């Protein structure tokens, strides 16, 4: 959001303009952080920079180091910059998103503060539901880089009648995907690196509206919130229980010490603990 060309970027899918300044078939996302929401609310300015003129700003985006560095560069009169009303920029972004669709938003600081990793999350996939650490590769066979892959499955919660039915389903999903990590082929070494050392699994659920209806709740009613909370809490508990059992059987993953789990921090702890800082 703070890139000097952001105003040109957010209109790339707009039907106005010419083929020279539009890329209408490109799908992309825009990263924001708390600082920019605060400036939107208070109707302040956002300062736009070229990443080449502000060393370290790109790497710190999404960490607790960003705000201080950003303000320092704002106050440095020797650095080229453009100031724009925060409300003007963000409302333009939302307008383009509403009119063209498929422009996604990522709250990069929140992704890091609530992730299960001590390593920094830099990016996501298009729909923003996969937030895994990555590391640049210097060439296609670079063994030191990390390309994040997410091994996915979903459980149809509309088919269950009791929360304890999730235990076997979650265990089956975890064990099945765990085997898939070692079974499948990897054409790129950096993808194999990340997947086998982190062993990240993405297990979600479908059929939520069905589940709520079976329990006498409407999808858009506030009374459904507690039911959904209880479902997701049980869902995650059983997934973590299965993962923990696998670690007892096979040993912990190679990068376990690079997770917040290694420090005893679970997702349910996020609102109660001061989290460790992410690495720069």
What are these regions (language model features)?
Residues 84, 147, 153-175:
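Glycine-rich, acidic/polar active-site loops that bind/position phosphate-bearing ligands
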Residues 271-277:
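Conserved small/polar residues in nucleotide/adenosyl-binding loops
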Residues 180, 194-215:
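Core structural elements
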Residues 19-20, 81, 159-164, 187-191, ...:
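Inter-helical turn/loop segments and adjacent helix faces that build the functional surface
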Residues 1-142, 148-151, 161-162, 190, ...:
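Active-site cavity-forming subdomains of large catalytic enzyme subunits
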Residues 236-260:
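Amphipathic alpha-helical
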Residues 10, 147-151, 175-187, 212, ...:
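Active-site-adjacent bridging/hinge elements
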Residues 223-242:
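Glycine-rich and small/hydrophobic secondary-structure elements
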